[in-house]
Amino acid sequence: MTKILGSDLIKRGMAQMQKGGVIMDVVSAEQARIAEAAGAVAVMALERVPSDIRAAGGVARMANTAIVREVMEAVSIPVMAKARIGHIVEARVLEAMGVDYIDESEVLTPADEKFHLLKSDYTVPFVCGCRDLGEALRRIGEGASMLRTKGEPGTGNVVEAVRHLRKVNAQLRKVINMSHDELMTEAKHLGAPFELLLQIKTLGKLPVVNFAAGGIATPADAALMMELGADGVFVGSGIFKSENPEKFAKAIVQATTHYQDYDLIARLSADLGEPMRGLEISELAVQDRMQERGW
């Protein structure tokens, strides 16, 4: 029996449809409905948001399928779910359930420290994290249809997301301005497929969308990432760990859409209540930095 796979064009096109929007982490049908009402373009179904995963420690796995199913039945917008890096069966289970996207995520404890999933072998599109252009292109080479910065999830601290997005964009500009005869050496340096560098040179951009994620906690954070060139934002703990999730959700969506309307962002930021409590990145031990997972 011939396996039917989704084409890159279709998978990447689905991701393009989320461009300019906000994708929110949710752990229940109620939260999913709040996210949809606030204007989220998609939701990520989890058992625990990243800050709770970080606090609990231990091994973080794919969410209980009952939670994923509950979220899928609660909303009409696309539903994403996370699988562990390299965990073939978690990804196959989520695909069989009919989720719209799978996030091969460093937020969960990696199942394989050497190999990422061969995402081109799945019908469902994948989103993956990256810290630099080399990571981005390796994931695209494996079949990722959408990228996001890794940032440092569950911290409410946007500094790492800023660092990663700026680095990817700086490396993109370098590749775009290279002559063709320099691309093979750069591909070797980045540890990335030559064909993808050639594609970037031709297109003048990444072949897939790149969202910002990891530490976005306020409307201003979301607007900052859009200002820096993100195609949209993921918000993990920032909404449902804030004092007023409904207000924060709506404000972050509006700030993402109107990221250069600073008067509006000022008004959106008033009377929101307390944002989630933030963590200083330098206080995290290396083994506690989720961004270090994967390669």
Swiss-Prot record:
Binding-site residues, D-ribose 5-phosphate: 25, 154, 215, 236-237
Binding site for D-glyceraldehyde 3-phosphate: 166
Catalytically driven reaction(s): aldehydo-D-ribose 5-phosphate + D-glyceraldehyde 3-phosphate + L-glutamine = pyridoxal 5'-phosphate + L-glutamate + phosphate + 3 H2O + H(+)
Protein keywords: Lyase, Pyridoxal phosphate, Schiff base
GO terms of biological process kind: amino acid metabolic process; pyridoxal phosphate biosynthetic process; pyridoxine biosynthetic process
InterPro entries for the chain: Aldolase_TIM, PdxS/SNZ, PdxS/SNZ_N, RibuloseP-bd_barrel
Active site residues of this protein: 82
Keyword Lyase: yes
GO MF, one example: pyridoxal 5'-phosphate synthase (glutamine hydrolysing) activity
Enzyme Commission number(s): 4.3.3.6
Family matches, as Pfam families: SOR_SNZ
Pathway: Cofactor biosynthesis; pyridoxal 5'-phosphate biosynthesis
Top-level taxonomic group: Bacteria
Keyword Lyase: yes
SUPFAM superfamilies, A to Z: Ribulose-phoshate binding barrel
UniProt function note: Catalyzes the formation of pyridoxal 5'-phosphate from ribose 5-phosphate (RBP), glyceraldehyde 3-phosphate (G3P) and ammonia. The ammonia is provided by the PdxT subunit. Can also use ribulose 5-phosphate and dihydroxyacetone phosphate as substrates, resulting from enzyme-catalyzed isomerization of RBP and G3P, respectively.
Similarity section: Belongs to the PdxS/SNZ family.
Cited NCBIfam families: PRK04180.1, pyridoxal 5'-phosphate synthase lyase subunit PdxS
HAMAP family the UniProt entry points to: PdxS
Subunit and partners: In the presence of PdxT, forms a dodecamer of heterodimers.
Name of this chain's protein: Pyridoxal 5'-phosphate synthase subunit PdxS
Lineage: Bacteria, Pseudomonadati, Pseudomonadota, Gammaproteobacteria, Pasteurellales
Gene: pdxS
